Amino acid sequence: MKKNTSLFIVAAICCFSCSRPEPQTEDILLSDGWLIQAESKVDQEWYKASVPCTVMGALTSENGLYNDLFVGKNYADIDKEQFEEPWFYKTTFETPALKEGQRVELAFDGISYRADIWLNGQQIASSEEHFGPFRQFSYDVTDVIAERNELTVKVYRWQKGEFNIGFVDWNPRPADESMGIFRPVWLRYSNEVSIKDPAVRSRLDTVDFDEAWLMVEATLSNASDKEVSGKLCGKFENGSFAYPVTLAAGETRTVKVTPDQARKLHVKNPRLWWCHNLGNPEMYSMDISFVADGKVSDSHKVDFGIRQIGDWFNEEGYRGFILNGKKVLIKGAGWTDDIFLRNSDERNALEVAYVKDMNMNTIRFEEVWGTSQNIYDECDRQGVLALVGWSCHWEWEVYTGKPNDRYGCISTEEDIELISQSWRDQILWLRNHPSIICWYGASDMLPRPALEQRYLDILAEIDDRPYTVHAGSAKSPLSGPAGMKMWGPYEWQAPYYWYSEEAKGKAVGFNTETGIGAQFPIYESLVKFIPEDQLWPVGEAYDYHTTTSRDALHDLNELKMVIEKRFGGATDLNDFIRKAHLTDYEGTRAMIEAHRVNVPRSTGIIQWMLNSAWPSLYWQMYDWYLVPTAGYWSVKKGCSPQQLIYNYGDNHLYAVNDEKEDVSMRARMKAYGLDGKLLCDASADADMPMGSSTKLFEVLPKGEEIDDVMFLFLTLEDRKGKVVSRNEYVIAEDMDRHDWSKYRWWRTQVDEYADFSALNTLAQADIAASMTIKDDILEVTLENRSSVVAFFVDLKLKDAAGEMIVPAFWSDNFVSLAPGETRVLTCRASSLPSGASVTVAGWNVSTEILKF
């Protein structure tokens, strides 16, 4: 929240007004000009830093150290002893002289893990009290501040048994254990009365959407030794209000203003906040101030959305979510911050844009991630839902360094006090974000009942959105069933797995984390972190960049097995990569699509994961270099608002509709053999109610007329014949088969693999490719001039040096073209520089470079 220094507010109630108050001093963000150094080296040259940053974040990003840290296994050799001792952060800054009656607080939004703090040589906080990364602290420094100031912060890293930022098994532990000032530092100004934690809540008429009711809430603190009378004022586009408040000397009180007290809080024809696939994410801003004696004592700008979120349970007991009266199928993925918490605002904006581009609508934050509120601001702006809660990091001894029982590691009264206060701080910090639709009390395990009761008491006091006890399927004695599930898998499973009633991870209910394991980056990314002499064969350097899980998932053996059994192995690195990409493409798409087919039995799916904290080969829709994986493009296709989907379980086509309007369309299917022979040409009308899945017709009976493999081409057309969406599949004569008795938490064993080895003999296709640029949009036309399918054609936009241009938002990628088919693909890119080119290549298509 930021100060607003000139409010001109006309009272909507009462006989007095807030007009033309004297402005106040703006808050100051202390971000630039910091220096850091280890305690034992304070007499040496200090490193420059910008806050927020961890120690490793500053050493790498701002001082150029450890440039090859992520190459091969180099990270294993980093000297971690240098972070065993405390590090100092220091900065100098100037401030305007305080006005009469003015007060100033020094606020820290997040430090890991402990800190001693001095301002102008006077200690204002001790590490015995200032600890816990998710606590937020504010200190009155009115009597210490000067016009020129020096701030020194001594930070101590996490120690075993403490509750730190929650990286788990998707990357190695941060070398510095995230030690540092990882969230903003502020100077906050006010007069006698300060405003804390202002919030705007909304209720909505979810039938006609023509009116909403707002409640404004703020905690007011009178720091003076006398009674203060004034007005809590608000101004937004619907009008203004002024609510009289009198505070006794030293009093702190939470004030709530409702439409009964301020009629302007009853909003007619509101602009609603929707997730992007249902509408526009409309936002409002409200200036909230406390005015006394004609002066603004304190003020904040609050951004908020008018929306109403709720939940429901289907017949099988699984939870789903309702936004503005509409049931929403959650389609999302799990977030992680960078390993050294170096996420820039620009990177956050792009990553959320990727979620939107994939036609997903949700991010799960298994941790209250973010070095500021920016990532949640982006979710608000771009219409992406957010599920926010604690990480399983605190539930297992291997990560926390403290024994766990069935409630995890948070066990003592001191632990419960720290975590419950952290819960309060984080919810107060984030509760104005309309994108956040649920708080998670835990991840893998239930929280201890005494801790959960604290959570529930806090929520009853400060927030009203849905809460679930954890991300699994357990039932709490206090809050009831979680209504979700976390049974995996986390490793590759055959596409039909998701449709099988026997599968633990079948596409029923709300699966809060699941994925197919290895999601291989493209060659251009791979060579940045795998040493050249270790690129082939795939070995230890690759395995080091999988996961740190102890039981499984720590090597590429499963992917190698799939490629060997389904494709007959790989002849070289490029062959391995394309087969890894196809494995990712069809496996990830099937996981998402099965949940769309199975609504309303399915209520949500979270792909594990969205992104990576470092260069990785596992669990990612795009890599650490922000280049999409093959799964990105299959999810983009599978999540198209209206789509045709092939059900691997019953061999039928389904029409699905995720938008908020009913539609009627025409479904078409063509099937081709390996030799390009047309096996089937069928069509049907598809009536597609909002939020529905409609069974259409059977594909060729399994095995009938299929010679090794069959290619399916599906199109959905509107009543004017315009293609709304496309989907392409390659199907083997016989499906993979699982042994359902051999279940482990990461996968169910596959006993028989589908045979796609015939793809190795697919005849060469002749593709004519051309390129034009119209209104800064790149258009590439692909014409298949051959009599066979042009399979798995990939387009890459590169600069003159051969580097991938990021971002490059293609309309589609990894496409297949039927014999004689022509497709036009478009691309919106961050830039189209001179010398750039598009590389076109495919499974059976020769590489062609289209130069600008």
Q: What positions do the PLM features span?
A:
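Active-site-adjacent substrate/metal-binding segments within catalytic domains
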Residues: L65-E94, K99-F108, Y113-L119, A125-E128, ...
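Extended acidic/polar, glycine-enriched regions
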Residues: D143-R148, E217-F313
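Extended carbohydrate-recognition surfaces in non-catalytic/accessory domains of CAZymes
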Residues: E22-A107, I165-I181, F313-N314, H545-A580, ...
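Accessory beta-strand-rich segments of carbohydrate-active enzymes
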Residues: E26-I28, Q37-E39, E84-I195, A223-S224, ...
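Substrate-binding/catalytic cleft of secreted carbohydrate-active enzymes
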Residues: T362-D551, K579, T583, G587, ...
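An acidic-aromatic loop/edge-strand motif
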Residues: L30, S50, L69, D77, ...
